[in-house]
Structures are given as C-alpha cells and as structure tokens.
Curated annotation (Swiss-Prot):
Residues 17-236 form the Glutamine amidotransferase type-1 domain. Keywords: Glutamine amidotransferase, Transferase. CDD domains: GATase1_2. Transmembrane segments: none annotated. GO terms for molecular function: gamma-glutamyl-gamma-aminobutyrate hydrolase activity; transferase activity. Pfam families: Peptidase_C26 (PF07722). SUPFAM superfamilies: Class I glutamine amidotransferase-like (SSF52317). GO terms for cellular component: cytosol. GO terms for biological process: polyamine catabolic process. It comes from the Bacteria. This is Putative glutamine amidotransferase-like protein YvdE. PROSITE patterns: GATASE_TYPE_1. The gene is yvdE.
C-alpha cells in the first residue's frame, strides 16, 4: 500500500464562495476514490509555507499535481497574453518547490493537466498561454460535453510508461494551455492528432504526466484507471 500525497487546490475567491467566505484547499473526490479503490491511502497536502514541504514529504510516498489555474507565464520568461486565464503565483511557488523537494527525495510524481504544464515549466520548458497561439483545430476545452466522455484521439508511444494504452486512444480534454517547448530531460510520449503534446515522462526521475483528466473517466475507461495503478504500484 502506498500513501499518496495530492497537492490541494486553493479556493481563494471568497465572493459567492460555496464555502461561506472561507478559503479552502481541496481536491476532486475522484482522485481520492481511484487510489482508495486500488487499495492506497490519500493525504491532501494544502498549499502552505515552502519550509513545511520536507515535513509533508515524510508523510507520503508519492506526489500528485492536479489541475486548476493557469501557470504564470513569468515563470518561463513571457509577459501575459490577453487570453491568459486566472493565475495563482502562491500555488505556483509552492508546487514548484514541492517538485524540487520530491525529486531530491526520489519521490515519484504524477501530473494531471496543469500538473503536466507546471512540470514542463519546472524542467525549463515553455507553454502556449492559449490554444489560439497554435494551429490546432481540436476542441481541447470540451465543455459542455461532460467530463466523463472522451472526445479526441491521441497517439501513444508504445515503449513508454503509457505503452499499455492503445496506440490510438481517446481522451477527454479540459485545458486551454499546452506545451510549446519541452523541458530538459522530458520525453513527449503522447500527442494529439494536431501534434500537441498530451503526455510526458522522465523515467530516471520517476515523473509521469498527462494533459487529459483520467480521474474523471477511471470508472468507465479501465486504461485510465491503469495510469493511477502503475503510478501507485511503483512501475514508473
């Protein structure tokens, strides 16, 4: 059994907050459910002072970076684009420091959506701040289609950590930022039909990340469940 540390998503917008004006750190229940279904324990790690990170890491075996706000373009040397969404510099700093500490402690990391993007930036890569900067014709922000429904195809490298996926696989999609330049030491292991990166890995450092949201589909798509299984069971 592994103890999985999921970095919490800060909810800082108190106006019309469902939490009665309280700031909170939360994660999707589906992240908790999939790991518990696989027999593992989950701890939600709140965004906190960076000096507390090493203490948090003593409590967990692995780290999960989830979705949420856009990654600040200042982290990769760009000014904000007009179509940049909400950013959270405090979360950015905390999660980047957590990535650094987790790598130093040899703790495996799984990134989902924003988590993939932030890992890419950590390793020196850059992002497209908005899909309008690309030539993609795929609807990567699939709303109002429900999140449980896969909507576009990806091609998967069969010699990668995701080699158990069909070579031509369908995923859901809820993002408007994507990788532009790949970070040093990272390998792109899945692409959309538009050529955009959909998954990355660094085998040496036990890093795996996907652009889609397998936590939304694991109950109906057994291949998506297996992503969490191989991560939790230590096969990446």
């Amino acid at each position: 059994m592994a103890i999985i540390g999921i970095l919490g998503t800060p909810y800082n917008t108190v106006e019309q907050s469902p939490f009665w004006w309280n700031k909170v750190s939360y994660t999707r229940q589906s992240f908790i459910d999939v790991f518990q279904d696989l027999g593992h324990t989950v701890i939600i790690l709140p965004v906190d002072k960076t000096e507390n990170i090493k203490n948090y890491l003593t409590l967990v075996d692995k780290i999960v970076l989830t979705g949420g706000a856009d990654v600040s373009p200042y982290l990769y040397g760009e000014e904000p684009n007009a179509k940049l969404g909400t950013t959270d510099p405090i979360r950015d700093r905390f999660e980047l420091a957590t990535i650094k500490a987790a790598l130093e402690a040899n703790k495996p990391i799984l990134g989902v959506c924003r988590g993939l993007q932030l890992l890419n930036v950590y390793f020196g890569g850059r992002l497209y701040q908005d899909l309008s900067q690309t030539s993609s014709q795929i609807k990567h922000l699939q709303s109002p289609t429900p999140q449980e429904i896969p909507t576009h195809h990806i091609s998967v490298e069969q010699e990668s950590a995701l080699g158990f996926l069909p070579e031509n696989y369908m995923v859901n999609s809820f993002h408007h930022q994507v990788i532009k330049d790949l970070g040093q030491g990272l390998t792109a292991i899945a692409h959309g039909n538009d050529g955009l990166v959909e998954a990355i890995e660094n085998k040496e450092k036990h890093v795996l990340a996907v652009q889609w949201h397998p936590e939304c589909t694991w109950e109906t798509e057994h291949f998506d469940k297996k992503i969490f299984e191989i991560f939790a069971n230590g096969t990446i």
